[in-house]
């Protein structure tokens, strides 16, 4: 990890922290919730060893990157704006893009807004979500899963923060990263995050050192910036009306664990495998379903994910 360089740049009105290693064509890695650049530690080291420059920012609201106060500052347009500005600041014209969880959502929007900056995309866990002009995102999730669904619970500023503050931060990360349930996460108001059982032991792919890194950073920053992505999701829906029906026009490989909760959302498998996904993403070249893998697949199965990323981007 010592070879990873940590830089801070100005972009789109914020200061952004980026982990960077290697030389060659650039691979931009976008983390999810509740994560950091650190989630890509295995991919950063691997990609740099096979001839790429791998860069992984702390996204807006996370880690050592600035965290604007207003939830309205966290739309996909803001986040993609940060990333375009970062590439400009670093003198990078085009990248291979890799996203996971919220990073995957941002990656889909990056490809919608600025396909000219993307050579190819490898996305993990979250398939493309076509915009339904009649139903905002959170309303759709509320209809499908009810008020206790975690995205719905995260909407009111301060509520989730209060819940998280009542739990040891390291314990919270153990519970989040090790949750192997494929059921939609529901957080009843009276119980909150304690509704998800903590693991008895850490899995082999996660160490106490890893947990402590996440916990230390989030103790410094709190969770508000990260939660604001959910609070701005419907504003993103509103502002992206011009892209209703637009297709993703970059080459794509999609990877998901067969035990990933996102893969078990109602309609997800049908959309991914029965033609809907390919219609919205016409340059979708491959869908990989990884057996016995859960949501944090880039950390749980790093060697497989490294190989899948390299095999795809090596074609271009």
From Swiss-Prot:
Keywords: Hydrolase. It comes from the Eukaryota. Belongs to the AB hydrolase superfamily. Epoxide hydrolase family. The keyword Hydrolase applies. Residues 25-302 form the AB hydrolase-1 domain. Pfam families: Abhydrolase_1. GO terms for molecular function: hydrolase activity. Epoxide hydrolase involved in the biosynthesis of cucurbitacin and mogroside tetracyclic triterpene natural products (e.g. siamenoside I and mogrosides IV, V and VI). Cucurbitacins have cytotoxic properties and exhibit deterrent taste as a defense barrier against herbivores. Mogrosides are nonsugar highly oxygenated compounds used as high-intensity zero-calorie sweeteners; they also possess pharmacological properties such as regulating immunity, lowering blood sugar and lipid levels, protecting the liver, and acting as antioxidants and antitumor agents. Its EC number is 3.3.2.10, 3.3.2.-. This is Epoxide hydrolase 3. The active site is at residues 101, 230, 295. It comes from Siraitia grosvenorii (Monk's fruit). The record marks 150, 230 as: Contributes to the formation of an oxyanion binding site for the epoxide oxygen of substrate. Homodimer.
């Amino acid at each position: 990890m010592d070879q990873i360089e940590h830089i801070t740049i100005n972009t789109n009105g914020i200061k952004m922290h980026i982990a960077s290693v290697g030389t060659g064509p650039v691979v931009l890695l976008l983390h999810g919730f509740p994560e950091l650049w650190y989630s890509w530690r295995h991919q950063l080291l691997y990609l740099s060893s096979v001839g790429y420059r791998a860069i992984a920012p702390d996204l807006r609201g996370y880690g050592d990157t600035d965290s604007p106060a207003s939830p309205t500052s966290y739309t996909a347009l803001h986040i993609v704006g940060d990333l375009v500005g970062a590439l400009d600041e670093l003198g990078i014209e085009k990248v291979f893009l890799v996203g996971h969880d919220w990073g995957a959502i941002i990656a889909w929007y990056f490809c919608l807004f600025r396909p000219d900056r993307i050579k190819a995309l490898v996305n993990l866990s979250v398939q493309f979500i076509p915009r339904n002009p009649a139903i905002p995102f959170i309303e759709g999730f509320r209809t499908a899963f009810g008020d206790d669904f975690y995205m719905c619970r995260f909407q009111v500023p301060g509520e989730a923060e209060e819940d998280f503050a009542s739990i040891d931060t390291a314990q919270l990360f153990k519970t989040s990263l090790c949750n192997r349930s494929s059921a939609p996460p529901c957080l009843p108001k009276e119980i909150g995050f304690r509704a998800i059982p903590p693991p008895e032991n850490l899995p082999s792919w996660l160490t106490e050192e890893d947990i402590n890194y996440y916990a230390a950073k989030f103790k410094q920053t709190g969770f508000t910036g990260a939660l604001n992505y959910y609070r701005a999701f419907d504003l993103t829906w509103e502002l992206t009306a011009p892209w209703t029906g637009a297709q993703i026009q970059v080459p794509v490989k999609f990877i998901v664990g067969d035990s990933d909760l996102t893969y078990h959302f109602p309609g997800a498998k049908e959309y991914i495998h029965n033609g809907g996904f390919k219609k919205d993403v016409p340059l979708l070249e491959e869908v990989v379903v990884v057996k016995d893998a859960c949501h944090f697949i880039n950390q749980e199965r790093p060697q497989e994910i490294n190989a899948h990323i390299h095999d795809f981007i090596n074609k271009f």
